[in-house]
Amino acid sequence: MVRGKKPVLPQTPAEVRPLSGSPVAGEPGAQNQLFGDAPGNYEIKAEDGIGEGPEGQKLRANTEAIRTLRRVQAENRNATPEEQATMAKFVGWGGLRKLIDPNTAGKQWLDARAELLGTNGQPPLLDGGDKGAEWIALQRSTTAAHYTAPEVVTAMWDVVRHFGFAGGRVLEPTSGIGNFIGLQPRD
């Protein structure tokens, strides 16, 4: 990079080029439809019930979200709006510590753990099973992850708008599960 010059970043999907030189989605020879019929960012609605319910319901939502993500990845395609709705219900592992301690967990926790790690006779949902980086990250996140409820996110958007933000590009401030993007006001 030349000193004093800012890099020019792509602004549209058409400007994005893979480093390997392989074709971009939508061009002849492309393998997936990364930008083809992409449904866009999922807009979270009140009726989605994001983060609602007891621990067991959140646990089931998390495992279903991971199962859905793995299917979409395996099929090398974009998620449908219905699949996006399922994945939007992922709340992280911060409040689900019982999952990592099989000695204090009930049947639903042990079943979910077996599904994630592949000890139920099926392929694991988490890469590498109980030795993989995803399981290690999950364990660590149970003490360090913090879920931001939709009501808090909506209130934060109200404050940002009050201070003059009227739309544009934003980054997911939590680097998390997408609630800030999913609850971004349309206007």
Model-derived regions, located:
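Charged, low-complexity intrinsically disordered regions
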Residues: 1-77
